[in-house]
Amino acid sequence: MAKASFILLGTLFLFGAIASIQAKEDLKEVTHKVYFDVEIDGKSAGRVVIGLFGKAVPKTAENFRALCTGEKGVGKSGKPLHYKGSKFHRIIPSFMIQGGDFTHGNGMGGESIYGQKFADENFKLKHTGPGVLSMANSGEDTNGSQFFITTVTTSWLDGRHVVFGKVVQGMDVVYKIEAEGKQSGTPKSKVVIADSGELPL
């Protein structure tokens, strides 16, 4: 009887562990794919394809997806709610590349599809390595349209910035962008999202 109970408990523990792993994997399930076609000083640098984690952070993922397509039209700022034509305004080697300010172009602006700012959805996903897509902010619950893509592990940002996607193709392009950066963050060249949109899964 005791042996049977031990086997049962062991089986339950195993299933519990598998379920826990599966739950974590589900959070990282790609629900949408979007792209940036990037130009550096007017010359094509290639395409970055990003997978969005819509199950883990649906509101944050939807904001980014819609800003890639431009489907929401013009925002309260009077500017199109669209990443197309916007710059990577802050690039720091061995850290990240930041963009998404389509209203000011210098890191002082941006706008979400929900209005100016929206709350941090959750911090379930972590900054585990290069290619992680996360929301840039100016403090708690100040998400707009600005985002960054990591080029290294940035675990100190966990719990402070909402992770909502990953680069699934084109990390070579991300590294090309990174090479245009300086420790001050000011790019050496003009790095622009020449086009953006959504791709089929």
From Swiss-Prot:
One of its GO terms (biological process) is regulation of protein refolding. It is found in: Cytoplasm; Membrane; Endoplasmic reticulum; Secreted. Ubiquitous, mostly in aerial organs (at protein level). Its EC number is 5.2.1.8. This is Peptidyl-prolyl cis-trans isomerase CYP19-4. Interacts with EMB30/GNOM. Keywords: Chaperone, Cytoplasm, Endoplasmic reticulum, Isomerase, Membrane, Rotamase, Secreted, Signal. Induction: Up-regulated by cold, salt and cytokinin treatment. Residues 35-198 form the PPIase cyclophilin-type domain. It catalyses: [protein]-peptidylproline (omega=180) = [protein]-peptidylproline (omega=0). Binds cyclosporin A (CsA). CsA mediates some of its effects via an inhibitory action on PPIase. Belongs to the cyclophilin-type PPIase family. Residues 1-23 form the signal peptide. PPIases accelerate the folding of proteins. It catalyzes the cis-trans isomerization of proline imidic peptide bonds in oligopeptides. May be involved during embryogenesis and organ development by regulating the folding of EMB30/GNOM, and thus, by modulating its activity.
